[in-house]
Amino acid sequence: MKKFLTLALSALLTMGLLTACGGKTTDKTVDLTAFYNTLAEEYGWAEDAASSGEEDIMMMNLEGDMLESSYPGLADVATKQLIAKAPMISAVVNEIVLAECGTEEDAATAASILQDRVDAQAEGGAWYPESMETWSNAQVVQNGTYVAMIATADHQEEIAEQFKEAASRGTAAAGCVKRRRGEGRRWSSAA
């Protein structure tokens, strides 16, 4: 049975790889709103107190002045989609930014802005030691024109992996790049 399953999976993988070499490319876009809504449902993030559960984290949109004060310059980056969410209570670390930018250069600019936010919060901007620790583990992930900043006390790695998987379906880029605090200003290949 294991041999059959291995053979079947190998055949499917080979067909998938051969199909990818067909020369035709289709632009697929990841619906970042749907992606965020799935995360919100899965992890208990709500925006409406009336329909939220007892354990839900109340989230809000960061727009206008709030967006600019948290991520200076991000509003000036050309984006096709931009979702920026933060908890209503600052002691809770659960900031999520998802963006599809106009170009890979725009995405790199957005990633740099988001990394600046991570660094500032980890170096004391978050005030509380536990919050600063969570921020020090935050990730900025870029895949082609897609970029995300994920700063959560729980589910950090899971969300980053889900984003990388979703973004890879929406871009023809060869691989994701991510940067964690402490890696300086250089990008490293994601494993």
Task: Please report, for each region that a protein language model flagged, where it lies by residue.
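A short, solvent-exposed beta-edge/loop patch
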Residues: M88, E130-A172
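Short, compositionally biased low-complexity segments enriched in polar/charged residues
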Residues: E54-V93, E105, W135
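C-terminal motif of bacterial Sec signal peptides marking the signal peptidase cleavage site
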Residues: G16-A20
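Positively charged n-region of N-terminal signal peptides that target proteins for export
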Residues: M1-F4, A8
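Bacterial signal peptide processing site
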Residues: G22-K24
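Mature extracytoplasmic domains of secretory-pathway proteins
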Residues: M88-D119
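Short Gly/Thr-rich strand-loop-strand
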Residues: A107-Q142
